């Protein structure tokens, strides 16, 4: 025997324990209760007997609400919560209906991955009917019609985060709390793949032909793509549905429904559209416009009018949009903007691609400008309220933001340059195609490995000085921004109505393009109404509405050059941002209206001779150029580019006698 460790071994290698004192039994108090069960009294216990029951206690069900409108409240009082949900699901099922079978899928609310806590196995569902004149009912049954489609309806950002992290590869929570996502192969819009149905109505109403962004398709091809998108969405186990609004003006808002397959798309639209209250959702009803986003599934290249596997299709008569072959979320935002460019003018409301802010005294300014002109920077002013950064309507009562969020560029973003955007990137924000550290999840905004078009989509409430609701009175100033790399446009010019229309239609800025030998020269670019890719009607129609509203409200037009002075790019210098801000401040305060003005040659601009805090020599470009002949030659060159661009609009008559067209043409460069 060996007892070196206090134990003993027997001869066959087994263990035996020494005789003697043993450890006392643990006393639990069980005997006092008359039971042999051991009880742990060390802490409180939960009111659950299973782990599923415990999980069900973690989430409190949202209490049913009553519509704010008293009449609606009376109507809903007799309708149970279950009946309201059934009506809601029937509407969604109808949206997802195949137009050949004329019946929608069996839809049920909730995530299919979550177990039901009531023990039921077959969820209550709704079936929706869709009556169409396109094709007769066939009564055909498909595999997708035999299964349930789970609808994740108007989920909160937290719920959408969970869905994205669980099921979408490439979705991560960054160190600042934002959701980083990838948009797949497409990291920007595909304007060449955008199509608009040309029918008896749009034939005469829309702008077609040279210079137009509207590329036609026929009704049949749209229906083929619609069926393809709907079949794809119905084949999925779950889809995301957002019911939201466009336009903060309550008299002219539009109800939109977005059906998508990705949490990324649902959160993006949650941020970009106006978010309804629970009361508004209960009485939402049938949407005015529906988007079917099947972007993960390609279109059929052999279908007529298709040029690639991507197709973004608008049918204004059906008020539907179909997305195939691109997961870039910006297609939804700009697709709806195009719809507003069609619907709002029918109500005599001007839709505008502009920024908008308001002073503490209620003075409103509109900012128009292409990429790189400073529209976002100048419209975001800590001394003024932000109404919106991109899309607006000008109604009979004032201005309103179309959207409920902002879609800001992130490339080279810094806290110092753009503090408002930097601070808005937090929990709830979608960060699109950014690069981040694999361990710390800190975003590197200077890294363009995925794309230069990195973006952040966040609710407008994330901006501290946002005006909620996003509406304001009639604008006092209409500011057209141009980054003139030719260096011949004045830092600021006061425009008459005809000049405002001419430069609004032109939509000018200049880009700096590099060449192989390192020489860089400016390239003029023009985009009608500062947003040609999104307008539906002829540009002159929007310009005429703008002039009419400016005239009736006494608004002043301004052209502000944020580009070069003292020479073209490579010779002159960029106009200091501090000078431009002083100009904008003088416009806001009204002091610039009181300045002394003189007229320039070629373009005939009215320019101030003096502005406090700005060197007088830069106010007239010719004074800042050392080579006067080079200035004149460059000025004539730019004037020629304006004339050439405007040729496509010259023959379009506005009004009965075309007199307005003549006034606009006369407001252009003369030499």
Curated annotation (Swiss-Prot):
Region (Disordered): 1-44, 100-127
Any one cellular-component term (Gene Ontology): cytoplasm
N-acetylserine PTM positions: 2
Modified positions (Phosphothreonine) in chain numbering: 66
Tissue-by-tissue expression: Expressed in cotyledons, flowers, siliques, seeds, leaves, stems and roots. Localized in mid-veins.
PROSITE patterns: PEPCK_ATP
Bias (Basic and acidic residues) ranges: 108-118
GO MF assignments: ATP binding; metal ion binding; phosphoenolpyruvate carboxykinase (ATP) activity
Residues holding Mn(2+): 334, 353, 390
Claim: Phosphoprotein is one of the keywords in the record: yes
Cofactor(s) named in the record: Mn(2+)
Catalysis: reaction(s): oxaloacetate + ATP = phosphoenolpyruvate + ADP + CO2
Biased composition annotated in UniProt, kind: Low complexity: 1-10
Binding positions (substrate): 189, 328, 334, 455
Subunit structure: Monomer.
Function: Involved in the gluconeogenesis. Catalyzes the conversion of oxaloacetate (OAA) to phosphoenolpyruvate (PEP) through direct phosphoryl transfer between the nucleoside triphosphate and OAA.
Record-stated family: Belongs to the phosphoenolpyruvate carboxykinase (ATP) family.
UniProt protein name: Phosphoenolpyruvate carboxykinase (ATP) 1
Organism encoding this protein: Arabidopsis thaliana (Mouse-ear cress)
């Amino acid at each position: 025997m060996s007892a070196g460790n206090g134990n003993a071994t027997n001869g066959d290698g087994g263990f035996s324990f020494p005789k003697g004192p043993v450890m006392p039994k643990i006393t639990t108090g069980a005997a006092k209760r008359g039971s042999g069960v051991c009880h742990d009294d060390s802490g409180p216990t939960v009111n659950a007997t299973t782990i599923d029951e415990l999980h069900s206690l973690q989430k409190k069900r949202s209490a049913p609400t009553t519509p704010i409108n008293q009449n609606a409240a009376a109507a809903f009082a007799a309708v149970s919560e279950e009946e309201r949900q059934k009506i809601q699901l029937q509407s969604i099922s109808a949206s997802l209906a195949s137009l050949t079978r004329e019946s929608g899928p069996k839809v049920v609310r909730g995530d299919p991955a979550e177990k039901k806590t009531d023990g039921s196995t077959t969820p209550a569902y709704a079936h929706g009917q869709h009556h169409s004149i396109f094709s007769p009912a066939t009564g055909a049954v498909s595999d997708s019609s035999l299964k349930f489609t789970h609808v994740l309806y108007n989920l909160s950002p937290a719920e959408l985060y969970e869905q994205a992290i669980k099921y979408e590869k490439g979705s991560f929570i960054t160190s600042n709390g934002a959701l980083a996502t990838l948009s797949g192969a497409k990291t920007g819009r595909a304007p060449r793949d955008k199509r608009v149905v040309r029918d008896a109505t749009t034939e005469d109403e829309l702008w077609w032909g040279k210079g137009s962004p509207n590329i036609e398709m026929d009704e049949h091809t749209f229906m083929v793509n619609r069926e393809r998108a709907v079949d794809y969405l119905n084949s999925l186990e779950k889809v995301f549905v957002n019911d939201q609004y466009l336009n903060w003006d309550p008299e002219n808002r539009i109800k939109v429904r977005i059906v998508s397959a990705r949490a990324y798309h649902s959160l993006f639209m949650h941020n970009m559209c106006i978010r309804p209250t629970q009361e508004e959702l209960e009485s939402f009803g049938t949407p005015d416009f529906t988007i079917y986003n099947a972007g993960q599934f390609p279109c059929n290249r052999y279908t007529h009018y298709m040029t690639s596997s991507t197709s973004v299709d608008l049918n204004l008569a059906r008020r539907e949009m179909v997305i195939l072959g691109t997961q870039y979320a910006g297609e939804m935002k700009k697709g709806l903007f195009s719809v507003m460019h069609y619907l709002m003018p029918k109500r005599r409301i001007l839709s505008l691609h502009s920024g908008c802010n308001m002073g503490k005294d209620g003075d409103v300014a509109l900012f128009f400008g292409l990429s790189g002109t400073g529209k976002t920077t100048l419209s975001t002013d800590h001394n003024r309220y932000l109404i919106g950064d991109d899309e607006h309507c000008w109604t009979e009562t004032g201005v309103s933001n179309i959207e409920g969020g902002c879609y800001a560029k992130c490339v080279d973003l810094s806290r110092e340059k753009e503090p408002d955007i930097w601070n808005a990137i937090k929990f709830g924000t979608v960060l699109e195609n950014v690069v981040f550290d694999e361990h710390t999840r800190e975003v590197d905004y200077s890294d363009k490995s995925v794309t230069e078009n990195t973006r952040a989509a966040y609710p407008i409430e994330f901006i501290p000085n946002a005006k909620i609701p996003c509406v304001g009175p009639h604008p006092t100033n209409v500011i057209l921004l141009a980054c003139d790399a030719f260096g011949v446009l004045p830092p600021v010019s006061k425009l008459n109505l005809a000049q405002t229309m001419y430069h609004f239609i032109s939509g000018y800025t200049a880009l700096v393009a590099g060449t192989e030998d390192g020489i860089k020269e400016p390239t003029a670019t023009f985009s009608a109404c500062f947003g040609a890719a999104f307008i539906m009607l002829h540009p002159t129609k929007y310009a005429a509405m703008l002039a009419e509203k400016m005239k009736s409200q006494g608004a002043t037009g301004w052209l502000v050059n944020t580009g070069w002075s003292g020479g073209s790019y490579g010779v002159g210098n960029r106009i200091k941002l501090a000078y431009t801000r002083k100009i904008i401040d003088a416009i806001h305060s009204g002091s610039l209206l009181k300045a002394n003005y003189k007229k320039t040659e070629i373009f005939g601009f009215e320019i101030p001779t003096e502005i406090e805090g700005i060197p007088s020599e830069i106010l007239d470009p010719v004074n800042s150029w050392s080579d006067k002949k080079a200035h004149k030659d460059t000025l004539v060159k730019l004037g020629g580019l304006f004339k050439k661009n405007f040729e496509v609009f010259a023959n379009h008559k506005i009004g009965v006698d075309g007199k307005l067209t003549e006034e606009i043409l006369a407001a252009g460069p003369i030499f």
